[in-house]
């Protein structure tokens, strides 16, 4: 029973991380009808930015985290403006292939910038230790797993409020439902596309940190871990945010 509970805790932690990547997949698909294969690369880029700022430049970790996550969102926005905006009206398959090229470009740029060697992410809790853990009923729970699960739940709740209450959230929902109708109502669809990619970049950066934090490091395999969120999206539904979260429970099978 203890082994089962331990596997369940670790599986839920992975599911939380996968859900952050999966939400980015879904947001982009709902707004643009395109499956973006660049999400895993954005996760790795986000982790690389955080590591570079915190470890290489000695910037306090929490400041590095905020800057790294924000910059990843900006990179997502730049990707949409530079590569995807000119592709509006092109076949969906062509745009999806383009996102594969963007994925390769982002990862190659990151490798040339910070190198291929595994990298430490920095310690957000120097007093307690990122590698610390608590034991409850014979089950060991790492602090980083608790942080990852809590962060994912908080982000999902905030996104739900954002989509229901805020002006831009409602505009994003309208755009995902019918772009032409949204345009007729005066919604700036191009701005919504940019916002979607900005949010997707932020979600990916959070996931990238939790994938590479703790005992893990930022390496070539980090991309593969982020890519495992894709099956969860396919099973949960490419246009379903709740489905992306539920589908991420597939990470339990990985355990």
Question: Model-found features: residue ranges?
Answer:
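Single transmembrane alpha-helix segments in multi-pass membrane proteins
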Residues: 4-55, 78-94, 173, 233-242
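Helix-loop-helix "hairpin" substructures at the membrane interface of multi-pass membrane proteins
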Residues: 14, 136-218, 241-246
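Alpha-helical transmembrane segments in multi-pass membrane proteins
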Residues: 18-22, 42, 46-50, 64, ...
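Glycine-rich helix-loop "coupling/hinge" segments at transmembrane-helix boundaries
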Residues: 39-42, 214-241, 246-247
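Alpha-helical transmembrane segments within multi-pass membrane transporters and channels
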Residues: 58-102, 109, 246-251
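Mid-bilayer segments of alpha-helical transmembrane spans in multi-pass integral membrane proteins
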Residues: 74, 100-116, 145, 157
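Extracellular/periplasmic helix-loop junction at the C-terminal end of a transmembrane helix
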Residues: 104-135
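Conserved small/polar residues in nucleotide/adenosyl-binding loops
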Residues: 253-255
């Amino acid at each position: 029973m203890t082994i089962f509970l331990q596997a369940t805790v670790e599986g839920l932690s992975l599911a939380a991380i996968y859900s952050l990547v999966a939400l980015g997949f879904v947001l982009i698909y709902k707004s643009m009808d395109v499956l973006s294969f660049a999400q895993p690369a954005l996760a790795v880029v986000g982790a690389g930015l955080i590591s570079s700022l915190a470890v290489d430049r000695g910037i306090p970790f929490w400041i590095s985290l905020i800057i790294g996550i924000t910059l990843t969102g900006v990179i997502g926005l730049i990707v949409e403006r530079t590569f995807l905006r000119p592709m509006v009206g092109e076949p969906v398959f062509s745009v999806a292939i383009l996102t594969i090229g963007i994925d390769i470009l982002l990862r190659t740029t990151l490798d040339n910038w910070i190198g291929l060697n595994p990298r430490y992410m920095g310690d957000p809790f120097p007093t307690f230790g990122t590698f610390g853990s608590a034991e409850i009923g014979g089950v060991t729970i790492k602090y980083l797993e608790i942080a990852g699960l809590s962060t994912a739940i908080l982000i999902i709740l905030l996104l739900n409020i954002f989509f229901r209450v805020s002006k831009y959230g409602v505009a994003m929902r309208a755009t995902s439902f019918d772009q032409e109708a949204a345009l007729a109502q005066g919604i700036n669809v191009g701005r919504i596309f940019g916002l979607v990619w900005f949010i997707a970049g932020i979600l990916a950066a959070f996931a990238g940190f939790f994938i590479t934090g703790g005992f893990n490091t930022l390496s070539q395999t980090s991309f593969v871990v982020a890519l495992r969120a894709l099956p969860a999206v396919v099973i949960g539904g490419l246009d379903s945010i709740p489905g992306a979260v539920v589908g991420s429970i597939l990470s339990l099978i990985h355990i």
